């Protein structure tokens, strides 16, 4: 079966999920900062830790699929963004402006190519670029900034602005959120094995 992953539903669905994930990550960054219990070292260490997992994914995918290995995927992005966003964690309206600019810039960079790979992390792709996972700084940093702005608005001083009753039956979703990194690391090999066996059966 020929499935087109470059357009249509198969293109839009993973990006919609990623947008929600990155937006919530921005809200979480704002929440952790407003607690007053963490400083830059926390974000630097956390960012480096996530980025190192991204590098591990790079090495694994290079060994498995060298023609489309992951050079700057969502873990690379989240690791870098966790550090770069630190000076903006207290900002509200300005983050909306910067977020919008970042998103527009990201779409503009889609039309730009370069003969070298050094600007991949910004959103400038080299010629004939193929990868399994790609989340450059632009436009995705803009989505994160919008999430930070939302977090600062809805949770000022680490308190919920809008009163909502607790929903204990949603605790499984909270568990998934607290362990999202491990879930991401596990889901890729599981999906690859699933697709492999489905391909064998068809």
Q: Where do the PLM segments sit?
A:
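Alpha-helical transmembrane segments and their immediate juxtamembrane cytosolic regions
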Residues: 1-202
């Amino acid at each position: 079966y020929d499935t087109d992953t470059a357009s249509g539903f198969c293109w839009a669905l993973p990006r919609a999920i990623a947008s929600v994930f990155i937006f919530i990550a921005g809200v979480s960054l704002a929440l952790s900062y407003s607690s007053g219990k963490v400083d830059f070292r926390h974000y630097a260490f956390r960012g480096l830790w996530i980025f190192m997992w991204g590098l591990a994914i790079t090495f694994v995918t290079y060994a498995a699929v060298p023609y489309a290995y992951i050079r700057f995927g969502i873990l690379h992005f989240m690791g870098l963004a966790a550090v770069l966003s630190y000076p903006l964690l207290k900002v509200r309206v300005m983050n909306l402006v910067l977020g919008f600019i970042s998103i527009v810039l990201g779409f503009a960079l889609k039309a730009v190519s370069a003969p070298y790979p050094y600007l991949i992390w910004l959103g400038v792709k080299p010629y004939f670029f193929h990868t399994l996972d790609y989340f450059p700084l632009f436009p995705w940093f803009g989505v994160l900034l919008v999430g930070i702005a939302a977090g600062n608005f809805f949770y000022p001083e680490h308190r919920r602005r809008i009163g909502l009753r607790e929903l204990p039956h949603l605790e499984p979703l909270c568990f998934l959120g607290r362990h999202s990194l491990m879930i991401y690391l596990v889901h890729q090999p599981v999906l690859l094995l699933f697709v492999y066996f489905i391909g064998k059966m068809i």
